[in-house]
Structure formats: C-alpha cells, structure tokens
C-alpha cells in the first residue's frame, strides 16, 4: 500500500495492524495484555480490525492488582464479552496472602509484587512467547528507546543495551525456549494520536477519562480519588467534590487526577493541544526515584 495515499492516522493504523498480524504469524502462543486504559482500548480495537470478521486468535490478559478503579473492572468485563475473546485475570495470590497494598507497603513494593511479579507469574504459567502491550515511545524516557519487538530473557528482564535492530519494519522474533518478546504496536503513536483515533473510530473508553464531579483528596500535590472505603483518610482530611478527569489509569491510590472541564472527546482533544505536561505526571510509581521506570522494566515490568 502506498503510504502517500493514507492520512497520518491511517498510516499508524496500518502499521499497527501489520505488527499484530506479524506476531500471530510468527509466534506460537501470543497474548494481549489488557490494562483497560485508552491505549489498551485502541490496541484491542486494532486487533479486532486485523482479524475481522473473525475473532483475534489470542486471549486478553489483565494483571489485576486488586486496587484498580471499580469502573475499570466493570469496563474490562464488558469489553471482553463484546469482543468475544477469552479473558485471563491473574492476581498474585502470594501478595494477597501477605496483605500487600499501596497504603500498607508503599507504591514501590506494591508495584513490584502485585504488577511485575504477578505479570511474570502469568507469563510463565501460560507459557506465552509474545505479549502485546499498549506502551508508546512518547510516554516516558525508557520507553522512548524500546524496540517494537522488545526481547526479554528467561527471567523476563529487559536489557536496553542488548536490543535487536529493526530496519525497514523488519522484526526479529527469534527466541530460545523460555525467552519471550514484548510487542508494542502503538510505539509510534502519540497521546494526541490516540485521542484523535478514539474520536475517529468511536472507540469506547472508561468514563474516568471524561471530566465529572468526583471525590478527591490532595496529597503531595496529587489529586487522589477516593474510590472505596479501603483508602485511609488522614486526620482532618475531607474528600472534596471536584471536576476532574484522568489522563492515565492505574491503581486508584497511585493515580492522580487533573482538574478539568473536558467532558467530551472534542474537549479532551482541545485540552491535549494546549497542555505542556506529561500524561504520566499523575502516576505516583514514576516518582519513586530517577529512572525508576527503566529499573522496573529491567526487572520485568511492562
């Protein structure tokens, strides 16, 4: 296909669909990690397009930390059913037994045990040799230098100095037993591209992305939504009802909201055109230490 005849978004769409089909052709047991966010929603939409009118020939998998927003879980179950795809939900039961949580153990331990170790458990349990993820290069520095086909060793570790060249959109999927590839079909998309494509394709997303009055408390400059009664309030702390939305979604105690009036897709896109801050500024886990995302990825984080 001549790219000169395609719009910018259609070029990105064609590239992503090509990557998804390549993985299915190359690997024996792929899986699509479904984190329920806007990028996962776009990736799922592209996968369904890639194999329409059939169903994508791989399952969805959600690594559930047990601390996701309630609206995210409801949306996850609905979308998996609508897509007609198998949904694997994996929870690190060892972490649950130890009572690991963001309040009791802090974001660093919680993320390592309930996300990184849980993901590695699931990949080993089901013996997946390729895993799709919705990460984009414009999100964060360590992701900016990651390949579309990101090689992981037998311990699921990522070595940024040992990456394979990807010339002329040719991807090397050769792995030995126990090794795997993390695949990022949205690598070349930007946050604005994602929102424009959601608008163009009318892709359903979690309502938390739209501005609404929600109960929040401000901690260390971050607006945290009080999503259930597990969140301990500090002395004298009272949740305020504020017009907020989320640019990125994760565990609710570790995800900051932004004050916003953008309640429709056109309003969100307009807001994106004017903003100068990173979408991950609201992710508490990114504030653990300098380079913390790269360190997490070296240990097996997505």
From Swiss-Prot:
Q: Does the keyword RNA-binding apply?
A: no
Quick one: which pathway? Sulfur metabolism; hydrogen sulfide biosynthesis; sulfite from sulfate: step 1/3
One GO biological process from the UniProt record? sulfate assimilation
UniProt EC number: 2.7.7.4
Cite a single GO MF annotation: ATP binding
Keywords (alphabetical) are: ATP-binding, Nucleotide-binding, Nucleotidyltransferase, Transferase
Q: Name one Pfam family in it.
A: PAPS_reduct
**Its catalytic activity?**
sulfate + ATP + H(+) = adenosine 5'-phosphosulfate + diphosphate
InterPro entries linked: PAPS_reduct_dom (IPR002500), Rossmann-like_a/b/a_fold (IPR014729), SO4_adenylTrfase_ssu (IPR011784), Sulfate_adenylyltrnsfr_sub2 (IPR050128)
PANTHER family with a match to the protein in the record = SULFATE ADENYLYLTRANSFERASE SUBUNIT 2
| Annotated function | With CysN forms the ATP sulfurylase (ATPS) that catalyzes the adenylation of sulfate producing adenosine 5'-phosphosulfate (APS) and diphosphate, the first enzymatic step in sulfur assimilation pathway. APS synthesis involves the formation of a high-energy phosphoric-sulfuric acid anhydride bond driven by GTP hydrolysis by CysN coupled to ATP hydrolysis by CysD.
- Describe the protein's quaternary organization and the partners it interacts with: Heterodimer composed of CysD, the smaller subunit, and CysN.
Query: Which NCBIfam families does UniProt cross-reference here?
Result: CysD, PRK05253.1, PRK12563.1
Family under the similarity heading: Belongs to the PAPS reductase family. CysD subfamily.
- Identify this protein by name: Sulfate adenylyltransferase subunit 2 2
């Amino acid at each position: 296909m001549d790219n000169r005849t395609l719009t910018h978004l259609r070029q990105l769409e064609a590239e992503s669909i090509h990557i998804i089909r390549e993985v299915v052709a190359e690997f024996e047991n792929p899986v699509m990690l479904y984190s329920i966010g806007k990028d996962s929603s776009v990736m799922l939409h592209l996968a369904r397009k890639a194999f329409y009118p059939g169903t994508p020939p791989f399952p969805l998998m959600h690594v559930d930390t047990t601390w996701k927003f309630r609206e995210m879980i409801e949306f996850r179950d609905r979308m998996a059913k609508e897509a007609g795809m198998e949904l694997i939900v994996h929870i690190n039961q060892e972490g649950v037994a130890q009572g690991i949580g963001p309040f009791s153990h802090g974001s660093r331990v919680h993320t390592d045990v309930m996300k990184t170790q849980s993901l590695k458990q699931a990949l080993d349990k089901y013996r997946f040799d390729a895993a799709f993820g919705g990460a984009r290069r414009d999100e964060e520095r360590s992701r900016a230098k990651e390949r579309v086909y990101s090689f992981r060793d037998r311990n699921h570790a990522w070595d940024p100095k040992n990456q394979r060249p990807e010339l002329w959109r040719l991807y090397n999927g050769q792995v030995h037993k126990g090794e795997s590839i993390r695949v990022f079909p949205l690598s070349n998309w930007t946050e604005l591209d994602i929102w424009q494509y959601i608008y163009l394709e009318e892709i359903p997303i979690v309502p938390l992305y739209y501005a609404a009055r929600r109960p929040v408390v401000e901690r260390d400059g971050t607006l945290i939504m009080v999503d259930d009664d597990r969140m301990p309030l500090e002395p004298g702390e009272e949740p305020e009802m504020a017009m907020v939305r989320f640019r990125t979604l994760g565990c609710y105690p570790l995800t900051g909201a932004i004050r916003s009036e953008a309640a429709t897709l056109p309003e969100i896109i307009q807001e994106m055109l004017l903003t100068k801050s990173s979408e991950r500024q609201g992710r508490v886990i990114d504030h653990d230490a300098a380079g913390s995302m790269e360190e997490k990825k070296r240990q097996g984080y997505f």
